[in-house]
Amino acid sequence: RIYPVLKENVRFCVEGVVGTAQGYAMSPATSPENDFLFGEEKKEKLTVAQYTENENAIVRNLLRDYLEAGRILGIRDELTGQAEKIFEEMAAPAVGSNGQILEWNEDFEEADPHHRHLSQLYELHPGRGITEKTPELYEAARTSLLRRGDAGTGWSLAWKILMWARMKDGVHTGKLMNEILHLVEPKESMNMANGGG
């Protein structure tokens, strides 16, 4: 029952990707809430890039699931061939100058290096493209998690817990599980750092 839904989503993505120097990508794209610094003096904040790892990761995982479902169901058609080509030639996750997974198509300086969003790590969680079987990306994901830090709202901490669990770091996972249970005072109207939101 899910295959027709996958197929229509894949059809949309196949028609939406464009060729870039690094491979196929959804373009242009933004990364949730975080900006990058641009210009000679790095004072200009921009949000739109040629592509983002987050959007590409979502497409990669969709294509991966669609192709796997087709193999299981014994379905192969013209769209299957297009999906295979795009999947094989998608812009891959890249590692930046600080050893982190790049959020955008270039190694732009983040406006907020400690931003609570980790959308560039979609292939770590909930995706399945960054694992111990991809050691360079796996370590770059760890570096990204450490660079962003542990602070965040409840939902952000939940994502970090799941990502640290995928890194098989029980100590860090446990630390964040304790943090997510941190009491947020009801008088506070907004608390973005200690499990609130």
Predicted regions and their residues:
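Acidic/histidine-rich catalytic neighborhood
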Residues: E8-A69
